[in-house]
């Protein structure tokens, strides 16, 4: 038997642990939306509006588009498909391709849903995957800008959570779930990963852990930085689609990219938004 003070202390400890534990996911009406955001802290799914950028507007990434769409189509039809890692330069269309391809395929596959999970909430993935496992819908789970940053044991625990979710434990991976991650890094390694202070063996073990996470993605698709002709082609495609005519279009587009120090699909789209606003035209 325990004394009253010990019992009270144990109750307080149990209450504190319950507050710290992730909330159990609350199943929404998935018919209400096709895109969702998962809030792991609250255990809630938040409906999001449909993604508006058409798939055919993504130019300069034709090979990447074809590979991703083929894999997604297989998944939506219940055929074997691989989890996907989209890696490469910032602003090259990794996240846009995922959402635009999803919207395109969802028009033909009513049961398809996309759920976005924040990279800081990877610890909730195993629980989320188990929650979705027996649903009739088919889910694309997207983690944008995935990487494992140095921190107090945060790096390897996040990697292990992702691996556990993708592998599915003794139950195996969910058949109705496709995991897609975007990253600037092919092996999801933090830049300047510091071996000093932790010891070479511990640092090497961390590195092996992170590389083993990338190996869980059966399909790797790289996105190189845009060259100038591809960037201008993207600008012209956007301008033609939205009826934005300008004799000095190329010159202005190049000035825009030079001011930002980058050429990418994102920069091209930002230029078009600026041009449309200048002309008083809605996109």
Language model: regions and residue ranges:
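Conserved catalytic/switch belt of AAA+ P-loop NTPases
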Residues: 148-200, 205
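Walker A/P-loop nucleotide-binding motif
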Residues: 78-100
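Dynamic helix-loop-helix/coil hinge segments at AAA+ ATPase domain boundaries and subdomain interfaces
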Residues: 4-5, 43-67
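Phosphate-binding P-loop
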Residues: 47-49, 73-81
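AAA+/P-loop NTPase substrate/partner-engagement loops
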Residues: 104-139, 148-153
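C-terminal alpha-helical "lid" subdomain
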Residues: 2, 22-26, 224-283
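Conserved AAA+ ATPase "SRH/arginine-finger" region at the nucleotide-binding site
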Residues: 183, 199-211, 218-230
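Interdomain "pre-motor" coupling segment immediately N-terminal to P-loop NTPase/helicase cores
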Residues: 2-46
């Amino acid at each position: 038997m325990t004394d009253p003070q010990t019992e009270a202390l144990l109750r307080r400890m149990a209450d504190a642990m319950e507050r710290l534990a992730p909330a159990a996911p609350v199943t929404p009406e998935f018919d209400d939306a096709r895109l969702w955001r998962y809030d792991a802290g609250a255990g809630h799914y938040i409906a999001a509006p449909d993604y508006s950028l058409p798939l055919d507007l993504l130019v300069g990434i034709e090979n990447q588009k074809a590979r991703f769409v083929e894999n997604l189509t297989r998944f939506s039809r219940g055929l074997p498909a691989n989890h996907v890692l989209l890696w490469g330069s910032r602003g090259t269309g990794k996240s846009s391709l995922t959402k635009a391809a999803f919207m395109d395929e969802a028009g033909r596959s009513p049961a398809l849903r996309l759920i976005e999970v924040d990279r800081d909430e990877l610890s909730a993935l195993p629980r989320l995957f188990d929650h979705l496992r027996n649903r009739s819908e088919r889910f694309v789970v997207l983690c944008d800008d995935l990487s494992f940053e140095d921190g107090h044991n945060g790096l390897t625990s996040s990697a292990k959570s992702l691996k556990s979710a993708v592998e599915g434990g003794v139950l195996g991976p969910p058949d109705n779930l496709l995991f897609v991650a975007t990253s600037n890094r092919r092996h999801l390694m933090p830049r300047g990963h510091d071996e000093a202070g932790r010891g070479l063996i511990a640092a090497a073990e961390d590195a092996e852990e992170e590389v083993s996470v990338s190996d869980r993605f059966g399909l790797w698709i790289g996105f190189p930085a845009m060259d100038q002709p591809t960037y201008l082609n993207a600008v012209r495609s956007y301008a033609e689609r939205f009826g934005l005519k300008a004799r000095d279009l190329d010159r202005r587009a190049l000035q825009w990219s030079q001011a930002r120090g980058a050429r990418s699909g994102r920069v091209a789209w930002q230029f078009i938004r600026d041009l449309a606003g200048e002309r008083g035209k809605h996109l």
